C-alpha cells in the first residue's frame, strides 16, 4: 500500500502527540488559536476512550478519533479555517452519538456546531440511500434532509469539504 500522508506523530505509548500534530497542521494553514484545536483533539480522544471502555466502538481496528485527525489534515492542506478543522476532529464523535450538538456548541461555539450539523445532514443522505440500513429514513424525511443539505451547502461550502 502506498502511504501518501505521514503518520501521526506519536508518544512512546502509541497515542497521538497532539502538540506535534498541531504544530504540523500549523505549517499547512493558519490557526487563530491552536489551543482550541488542542482542546478538540483531547475531547475527541477522551470520548473515544470512553466508548472503547464501554465496548461501544465504531469498527474493529478503526479509530473515529484518528479519522477526525485525518479529515482535519486534508482540510488543512486545502487551507480551510480553524473552525473547519475543529469540526472535522469532533464530527465522528457526534455521528457515533458519543456526544451531541449541544455539547459541541457549549465547547466550541455556533460556527463549529453549524458545520458538524451540516455534515451530519449530508451523511444522512448517504445513509438513506442504503436500503439495507435499518436507520433509513422515510421518503419524506429523505426529501427534507436533501432540502436541508442543499440549504446548508448554499449557506456554507465548508460543509461539503468536511
Q: What does each model-found stretch correspond to?
A:
Residues 1-162:
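Active-site helical microenvironments for divalent-metal-assisted chemistry
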Amino acid at each position: 500500500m502506498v502511504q501518501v500522508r505521514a503518520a501521526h506523530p506519536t508518544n512512546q505509548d502509541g497515542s497521538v502527540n497532539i502538540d506535534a500534530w498541531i504544530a504540523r497542521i500549523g505549517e499547512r494553514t493558519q490557526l487563530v488559536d491552536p489551543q482550541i484545536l488542542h482542546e478538540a483533539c483531547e475531547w475527541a480522544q477522551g470520548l473515544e476512550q470512553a466508548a472503547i471502555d464501554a465496548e461501544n466502538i465504531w469498527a474493529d481496528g478503526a479509530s473515529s478519533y484518528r479519522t477526525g485527525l485525518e479529515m482535519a489534515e486534508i482540510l488543512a492542506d486545502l487551507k480551510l479555517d480553524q473552525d473547519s478543522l475543529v469540526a472535522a476532529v469532533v464530527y465522528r464523535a457526534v455521528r457515533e452519538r458519543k456526544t451531541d450538538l449541544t455539547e459541541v456548541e457549549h465547547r466550541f461555539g455556533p460556527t463549529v456546531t453549524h458545520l458538524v450539523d451540516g455534515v451530519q445532514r449530508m451523511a444522512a443522505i448517504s445513509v438513506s440511500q442504503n436500503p439495507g440500513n435499518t436507520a433509513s429514513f422515510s421518503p419524506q424525511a429523505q426529501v427534507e434532509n436533501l432540502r436541508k443539505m442543499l440549504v446548508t451547502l448554499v449557506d456554507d461550502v465548508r460543509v461539503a469539504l468536511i
